[in-house]
Amino acid sequence: MQLRTRLSLEYCTVLLESCIQSKSLFQGKLIHQHLLKCLHRTQETNLTNFDVPFEKLVDFYIACNELKIARHVFDKRPHRPKNVVLWNLLIRAYAWNGPYEEAIDLYYKMLGYGITPNRFTFPFVLKACSALKEVSEGREIHFDIKKDFVLSNVYVSTALVDFYAKCGCLDDAKEVFDKMHKRDVVAWNSMISGFSLHEGSYDEVARLLVQMQYDVSPNSSTIVGVLPAVAQVNSLRHGKEIHGFCVRRGFVGDVVVGTGILDVYGKCQCIDYARRIFDMMGIVKNEVTWSAMVGAYVVCDFMREALELFCQLLMLKDDGIVLSAVTLATVIQVCANLTDLSMGSCLHCFAIKSGFVLDLMVGNTLLSMYAKCGIINGAMRFFNEMDLRDAVSFTAIISGYVQNGNSEEGLCMFLEMQLSGINPEKATLASVLPACAHLAALHYGSCSHCYAIVCGFTADTMICNALIDMYAKCGKIDTARKVFDRMHKRGIVSWNTMIIAYGIHGIGLEALLLFDNMQSEGLKPDDVTFICLISACSHSGLVADGKYWFNAMTQDFGIIPRMEHYACMVDLLSRAGLFKEVHSFIEKMPLEPDVRVWGALLSACRVYKNVELGEQVSKKIQKLGPESTGNFVLLSNMYSAVGRWDDAAQVRITQKEQGFEKSPGCSWIEISGVVHTFVGGGYRSHPQLAQISNKLDELLVEMKRLGYQTESSCVFQDVEEEEKERVLLYHSEKLAIAFGILSLSPDKPILVTKNLRVCGDCHTAIKFISLVTKRDITVRDASRFHHFNDGICNCGDFW
């Protein structure tokens, strides 16, 4: 019986070897079943005969990518195997396929059983460590390698170089590399590819490539390692150098090298070179090549060409080229950039049919596409249907809500993301901070800032720019400046953001000083800088400075003014009441004035009650086609201010006939991290209705005692004065301020945000409220910030 069992086991081992070659899972499982029966029936006390077939069984399951079953067989084997080869097989499988933690865990179990690793064990474990970026574990294994005297082995040393380089420990990688007695092409390639992964490493990579040629000849894998470093610097010269090197060495025929060079040309914005490489590759092109060419078109902003190429790729499916999720996601992103909902929807259907819709990357780009096309409800429906979501999924939906004007929902999704246990990324904060800025939600903005500090995101310029904007729009201009001053690196956007922040707060002199500082640091202003600067001069009444910099923009900096610059200049001159100069300026404009230019002039006509000019300007706007309700409101206000009620009513009728609905006045205030919203006349919806109403009545009595009179012209309806007074009393900003007085201690400033311009009566009333209550009150309206203190507003009563 024992002899028969032994023969049966030997036969099973031979059969399993055959199954490994043929990857026949079904046959292998039958042999596994037979081995278990033999093990159950055997009466032998020594089970060592079963070691070889069970080890071969583990090898078989690894070959068939059935890692879970392989591990189960390994753990349940009759004897603990002392064969280091078997341990290496399983460690290698985990190192290549994951979970990588299991490879490291097996390594330590192996040591615990007294099994000595060999020169093949260490490279596999180090590969798992590099995948996990487990530097401390890798250093311990390095110590074990030194202890076992295998550092002289080129295979082990190369693995150490690769591990340290991929983990960013470049000095350690260089130290190991320099100590190697012998370096083959694989060792050099590991060093080069490892350095290529890290920003700013091109010079070192180029130096290594030159040194390598004195030792061994580079191969195509060397070039594949060099190309990421070239792509990082986006240098066409370096790209051409590597391309020439490949031509001389005969590497251009390699599909991987050709695809890499194509990718470099795309990232260098040299689409013609990229397309030439693509066409020269002929039939050797694979799916990655096609995907790289599509990506190159996207990087160079040739979106339609990217779609056309994708359609060509779909027709090649019968030629064996298989579409990948990466390519599909790239093309869906193209539809998002073009806001091509029709094509995007077709690709969504294709993703469903092909099964790619289950891919997380494809799902995230579909979310982004629907959001950018304005179909936020469709994006949310798809988001709810997703089986798996990550930080990118939440970021896409948050960004969609914010971009489509629903910051409150975006903030709610941000909170849901955190409750789901998913940590926000840099891109998430870059989407959330504008929502906080729009809502003036300082509590959430400050919390996001703290999170950014903890995660090290404040080193990112984009995050700092968003923080400056958020703090400025939450009324904390000093905090915004602190963020600006502490930035490690300030780009032109950073300076522009800070200049416009000073502008909307009416601190034009600081904006001018900052502009001087920017030039002192050697940074050249762009066209947006001058829009910010002239706007800041306009809000602060700095007419001479605004005129000077408008002229200097062309004469000293060679920047041709755009329509936005002319609109800012018209606003600057109009605010100062210089109507003759405005008229002359508009006549001399090389561009035909648009609605923005005439709208700026109409706003001044309202303030100065220049009805005649206002009517002329309004006709110009009507001829061009008004873009929003704002200009209708300005004209209606102007008629109401001089008692021309019929004309004011006619403007509102025209507004409705042309399909422009006036947005209801809405104001909000943040108290203890909760944003409270008030709609004009809609105070009844608030739970503290009675207290708010009583506080407003109390304030009205005190204000009248100090000389306050309602500006009834701000009521468009021709009704009794008493009724006008009640209508004005319940404007949204007054409701929010009254709630702030009730909710905040007297030493706390009040910040209210409004979606429209503050009306004249509210502006006057808030000056009186600041005088009565002895409180600092800040109101951010659609135009600027109004800082009220002791009955005075910093806008000088012009907004």
Language-model segment annotations:
Residues 1-184, 190-799:
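Terminal (and in a subset, N-terminal) low-complexity or junction segments at the ends
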